[in-house]
Amino acid sequence: MKTKEFKLKKDKVPYNKKPEKISFKEWQIALRKQFALDQKFKIKNSGEHPVYSDFDVTNPTTQKTYKVAIRSNTIGYNFCSCPDFKVNNLGTCKHIEYVFAQLRSKKSNEKIFNTDYKPSYTSVTLKYGTERKIVLRIGSENNAAFKELATDFFDKQFFLKEDAINNFGVFIEKAHQLDPAFRCYPDALEFVIAEREKKRRHSIIEKNTLKAMMMFN
């Protein structure tokens, strides 16, 4: 989803009142972008790619360090281990926005941001936002084979089908057979496990309700 951009250096976004011309979500994202510009976090790239990589972001004041994973230029596909990111349903946070601001400030990264990035490996990730979804991102290695495998588990937009949750382990096993470099990120796996448990509990409730109804008939 594309969000409206503020020229933050010229137009300060008010913290105590939402501007009328934007939605609540756009306001909250803009606030985090604005706050990020004033920070002096320390960044360490713990991966291999200059942009699409894992970063350790440390606040020198609190000495707290969070992991930021930059996987896409599109909001919702990145990750941060901070508490705010886990609950805000925005798909971003001040740490992600700070990393993006620092990366975009380097002229050497300009071409990377203007080019579609496709890694060699295929991965399963969790798309964050108002609605969280499991998404398959197919890399360049064994591209055709992964697309064929995906048809039984993912829709045309490569979001996990609802009826494929219980068979997710089968997909993971076959994906690793296609390419040992295949990745399923921990937050995506945790989400699938949680969704399975919700379905299991719902099924138990339905069965118990049906039994109770039959007893009184």
Provide a role label for each language-model segment.
Residues M1-N217:
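Long, low-complexity, compositionally biased intrinsically disordered regions
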